[in-house]
Amino acid sequence: MENENKILIIRVIRSFEYRTIKNLILKDIDLNTNVSDFKKLVADKIQTTPGFTPFKTKQYDSMKIFFVPHGQKPNNLTINIENDHFFLNNNKSLAENGVVYETEISFFVMEDYLKYKENPENKW
């Protein structure tokens, strides 16, 4: 049976308007992990990984697939606002949500996302 542990790229988004984004590379992630448990893991990594000091103050609560390997990248460089079906369901595993090896997942605050989606304007 194929090993289910994969590398995932998490795009931690502090600000949509200013494109304040930092990538967190996670290795050996079991794709059968529940999304709610995965969010806790990522939040813990943000608190303990060097270089994420400006990102520690936000309470990130949502995940959405930004890019699936061998797929088309979205036009918006901050987040994939075209495909709302890419939100990760907390009650399903990563694999059940369509996450595969080297998937890029955005991690952000939903309230900030909704404001940005109404007016996707960059301020820089």
UniProtKB/Swiss-Prot annotation:
PANTHER family: UPF0538 FAMILY MEMBER, UPF0538 PROTEIN C2ORF76. InterPro entries: UPF0538 (IPR018794). Signal peptide: none annotated. Belongs to the UPF0538 family. This is UPF0538 protein. Pfam families: DUF2340.
